[in-house]
Amino acid sequence: MSILLVTSSPRGAASHSTRIATEFAEKLLAADPSNTLVVRDLVANPLPHIDADYATGIYTPVEARTPRQAEVVGVSDVVLDELFAADTVILATGFINFNISSTLKSWVDHIARSGRSFAYGENGPKGLVTGKKVYIVLASGGIYSEGAAVQFDHAIPYLRGVLGFLGMTDVDVIRIEGVGMGPDAVTAALAKATAKVDAVVASQQAAAAA
């Protein structure tokens, strides 16, 4: 199994989402030595935001692209190749102003590309990125999975929507909630997330042994 880990929190290694997602990937690797891992660290190596050269370059024949168009479209090609090569995708993000990080949004902009990850046909758009299992690891200061605050969670609906549009409909969410509500809340949130990670790993081990 090929695993793609995408981390995006501006807090880097100190981030709860990065920590849990990284531990998740490492446990999957340990569970099966044949598994492989590719890490896309969007903090250490941020992707450029799409611009006019990208917008025109993706519709320009390769041989006719300007050097700048070739550069920015080349970035998109690299992250798309990483995505298509993966069987399992782990996306880690903090909950920033009720949504995903801007670094992760830039990654989404590079993978959501007409002609490569989706195509328009007689019946409308069709996602071309299929057969993937996606896990979203989301850390938030408050609790947004239930109660009145649910209305402020634009991160998970957005990611489910855009990933589904591209063909990735098998999506699970691992939340690390309430980390801004005191040390005890942090401990509880991390324990709950770790338990879910361990359950997923155990399930995959059982399936492989069956």
Swiss-Prot record:
Its cofactor is FMN. The gene is azoR. Belongs to the azoreductase type 1 family. HAMAP family: Azoreductase_type1 (MF_01216). Keywords: Flavoprotein, FMN, NAD, Oxidoreductase. It is an enzyme of class 1 (oxidoreductase). Quinone reductase that provides resistance to thiol-specific stress caused by electrophilic quinones. PANTHER family: FMN-DEPENDENT NADH-AZOREDUCTASE 1 (PTHR43741), FMN-DEPENDENT NADH:QUINONE OXIDOREDUCTASE (PTHR43741:SF2). FMN binds at residues 9, 15-17. It comes from Mesorhizobium japonicum (strain LMG 29417 / CECT 9101 / MAFF 303099). This is FMN-dependent NADH:quinone oxidoreductase.
